[in-house]
Amino acid sequence: MTTFYTVLSWLTFFFYWLLIAGVTFRVLMHRRPVTSTMTWLLIIYILPLVGVIAYFAFGELHLGKRRVEHARQMWPSVVAWLEELKKCKHIFAKHYSDVAEPIFQLTAKRQGINGVKGNKIQLLTTCEDSLNAITRDINNARDNIEMVFYIWQSGGLVEEVTEALIQAAKRGVKCRIMVDSAGSRSFFRTNGPARMRAAGIEFVESLQVNLFRFFLRRMDLRQHRKIVLIDNYISYTGSMNMVDPRYFKQDAGVGQWIDIMVRMEGPVSTTLGIIYAFDWEMETGERHLPPPPDNNIMPFEQANGHTTQVIASGPGFPEELIQQSLITAIYSARKELVMTTPYFVPSDDLAHAISTAAMRGVDVSIIVPRSNDSFLVRWASRAFFTEILEAGVKVFQFEDGLLHTKSVMVDGQLSMVGSVNLDMRSLWLNFEITVVIDDECFASDLSIVQYDYIARSTQLTLDEWEKRPFMNRVLERLCYFFSPLL
């Protein structure tokens, strides 16, 4: 019996270290930021079994066999569709402003199409304005309505959107809605989805979360885009979920969420449409490619139209493109750079680009909420404040709610608006969307909103920051340790 237990112990010991060695090799063979690799290795060695389970659940980007197969099957059709779109040469811009040209060159190289011109873009600065505008456009829809949101929650003005969708479906408009399973889990416990499906709306739960899928697909990979498409002509995107902030997370203690959206008319809606079609087919297996732009209704030739590029991220899209675009925009800045984000946990490359911009004389401002709904992110973000404050970056802490707006404005000319947070999850993992707009008037509108945020904020100075308690510094560093995983 003693021999049996001895052999069993040695076999356990052997397989244990074989498992650790195998997972270590797997971690090292995946290309990722060094800080992320080191963090995973430390977790695996400090908490071996827990670390191994956590790594296979959250450490690798895998969609699941079914979605991978859908993506593989549809890619040739997407490529063919893009080639057809390129034949509409009059919709593509040939010239950009000096500050915008580098980012448009980058995105054209990585995505295969240039920016599109002749768009009409309106900045919607409150959730009330955004929800009312969406409802009006739904009421006027004739052909199709497509939406994707991370969070959908009933209450307030969202009920008007829902009722408008139901009435649109009843009059024959094709309605397809996709919402994230984790972000909208409370909504799926209500009769809301069933009510819309009964009206003829296709309502899909994206990236479903349950115990049986835990090891089949990465659970923290989320559908974080916010897109509305109407009649292949009108589109919306931005930071707002399908929620009325007066009824959303009122017990979180952070105040109402503050968001912006952009309403767009023109060929940019077609480029958003192919992204939605990709997501829909990956989730359902159904193919609904958008039609090419209609020459009779698209405002191609408007001299004052906005030049726009859409950047998408997530599995199946060009890797790291949103981070590359952000860094390119930052290095293009010569006078002014203003950024708003609810979660500031940047990669080292992004943090260094921001600091370098300030050190070379650019007026850099970052606006973040004083309080947000994530304990880890709140403290991890503060670990970056010393570096950027010492470089001369102005840090403003928004006092009037949870500032959820994700925006970038460069030199009063280049703007970026979308769903992307300045954290590792948005930059490296989730399905995200950002629109890049090369237009002085739009940048002026955005800067007015950003400076309104600053007026409702408190500036954090380096002297004040260095006086924070020692335990705060310890907590910041502990949370910073996990920043590559946030």
From Swiss-Prot:
Catalytic residues of the enzyme: H224, K226, D231, H404, K406, D411
InterPro entries: Cardiolipin_synthase, CL_synthase_A, CLS_N, PLD-like_dom, PLipase_D/transphosphatidylase
Transmembrane helix among keywords: yes
Boundaries of every PLD phosphodiesterase domain copy: 219-246, 399-426
UniProt-recorded Gene Ontology molecular function terms: cardiolipin synthase activity
Catalyzed reaction equations: 2 a 1,2-diacyl-sn-glycero-3-phospho-(1'-sn-glycerol) = a cardiolipin + glycerol
Function text: Catalyzes the reversible phosphatidyl group transfer from one phosphatidylglycerol molecule to another to form cardiolipin (CL) (diphosphatidylglycerol) and glycerol.
UniProt similarity note: Belongs to the phospholipase D family. Cardiolipin synthase subfamily. ClsA sub-subfamily.
HAMAP family xref list: Cardiolipin_synth_ClsA
Name recorded for this polypeptide: Cardiolipin synthase A
